[in-house]
Amino acid sequence: MAKIIAFDEEARRGLERGLNILADAVKVTLGPRGRNVVLEKKWGAPTITNDGVSIAKEIELDDPYEKIGAELVKEVAKKTDDVAGDGTTTATVLAQALVKEGLRNVAAGADPLSLKRGIEKAVEAVISELLASAKEIETKEEIAATASISAGDPEIGSLIAEALDKVGKEGVITVEESNTFGLELELTEGMRFDKGYISAYFVTDAERQETVLEDPYILIVNSKISNVKELVTVLEKVMQSNKPLLIIAEDIEGEALATLIVNKIRGTFKSVAVKAPGFGDRRKAQLADIAILTGGQVISEEVGLKLENAGLELLGTARKVVVTKDETTIVEGAGDAEQIAGRVAQIRAEIENSDSDYDREKLQERLAKLAGGVAVIKAGAATEVELKERKHRIEDAVRNAKAAVEEGIVAGGGVALIQAGAKAFANLTLQGDEATGANIVKVAIDAPLKQIAFNAGLEPGVVVDKVRGLPSGHGLNAATGVYEDLLAAGVNDPVKVTRSALQNAASIAGLFLTTEAVVADKPEKNAPAPGGDDMGGMGGF
């Protein structure tokens, strides 16, 4: 395909236009008084959301340079969402502010590489201050406050706090749709490990890109499976039982994988294959954990079991299995309670006897998966559109609360960035264009608070000036319009969210500033007419 190339200021401004279009659509959602955005879907009802990354994903632009600019900012939102589970809108607003200030300085003749270095040093200094000012979460109420802000609903916040209290920070919290109106919390025994489906052909829910198996058999094999003959016996027995099958093995490839996929596509037999978690001895131990939890056995030649001879009695079972591209969750494994308790006691003893911090950490993870269980939050709503939006908010709030437990909290509402910045810049000594780069960060960190104030109908400049004069931790509670001690009022953000937002925004801003050329696909002017050729050469007949 032919390419078009833009250079210098034209290239950077094209990227900036794309960034601005996307950021302007996303930033209306920031803060307690932020608005929603309606997203049209090709199929089904439209989605209403205030989640930055969901909005960003839906935006596709015509202009090739603008499209690339928008894609770069999508990456900021996505990366922040992946790491912290929230803060996507803050990251987008910060990226827009950093790029705007940065490009102004590049146009005025500043050296882009020096600006980038200055931005990186300033961001590092601000993050150090953020981490130093972080307060560890100690109570259930603090978790509830953090989750409530993310979800915009105190009821959701307190439910998430209760769920985290029950399963611990290593436990798993999932969100399911409910037929009843309102919210309920259900605790189920379960386990999650970080391996997803081997092939996307196994997906049963295309929108969420996950495979859901109800009441499946679970085949656990400590070796590779490539020959379909090994699987035939067990597949026939499972198919006769009319149940789906989860296969956990070192790897599944070749004709064995192809057979499973073909049967899934034809609708003959529902299954999903995932790789076993871990490596070496740790893999063996984790497979044994899964076997005990599900009431199955690990099929391994070491213990004299061969796959081709396996019957249903060697397979585990569970109420439900959910597999995404990255992880597998087994809910309500049918294992014997005494055996599970024995395994938990054995792992606890290993933790006590272990000298290695790394081994202890890995054993602790295994213990949490066996003993922690899974908390299921069931959400209901009046309409499908509202249900989708509510479910999404709860999922974000869960990740937000976990981030808060992990690294602590800081004052919310964009205040922590400004106050950490004030301390960081007082001690930062840079020269020349690096100092200019640091100044870009100094200006940009005001942007989230300004946007929160703007969305609340207040004058952004006045609010920022007022906050600068307040004691540390005090700021604007945009929900009430009152200036107060934000942590005491329960207005807080996980430091992990704020830190990730600033880091990712600065990373992309540095790329924008140092870009000198953009190569894009040339837009096609005349798309071919639908339905075949234009009868060229037929003299109009």
Swiss-Prot record:
GO cellular component terms listed in the entry, alphabetical order: cytoplasm
Catalytic activity field: ATP + H2O + a folded polypeptide = ADP + phosphate + an unfolded polypeptide
CDD domains: GroEL (cd03344)
Entry keyword Cytoplasm: yes
Uppermost EC category: isomerase
Gene Ontology biological process terms from the UniProt entry: protein refolding
E.C. numbers: 5.6.1.7
UniProt: ATP binding residues: T29, L30, G31, P32, D86, G87, T88, T89, T90, G413, N477, A478, A479, D493
Pfam family, one: Cpn60_TCP1
InterPro entries the UniProt entry points to: Chaperonin_Cpn60_CS (IPR018370), Cpn60/GroEL (IPR001844), Cpn60/GroEL/TCP-1 (IPR002423), GroEL-like_apical_dom_sf (IPR027409), GROEL-like_equatorial_sf (IPR027413), TCP-1-like_intermed_sf (IPR027410)
Top-level taxonomic group: Bacteria
PROSITE patterns hit by this protein: CHAPERONINS_CPN60 (PS00296)
MF GO annotations: ATP binding; ATP-dependent protein folding chaperone; isomerase activity; unfolded protein binding
Main localisation: cytoplasm
Known function: Together with its co-chaperonin GroES, plays an essential role in assisting protein folding. The GroEL-GroES system forms a nano-cage that allows encapsulation of the non-native substrate proteins and provides a physical environment optimized to promote and accelerate protein folding.
Assembly and oligomerization: Forms a cylinder of 14 subunits composed of two heptameric rings stacked back-to-back. Interacts with the co-chaperonin GroES.
Family statement: Belongs to the chaperonin (HSP60) family.
PANTHER family: 60 KDA HEAT SHOCK PROTEIN, MITOCHONDRIAL
Annotated protein name in UniProt: Chaperonin GroEL 1
Name of encoding gene: groEL1
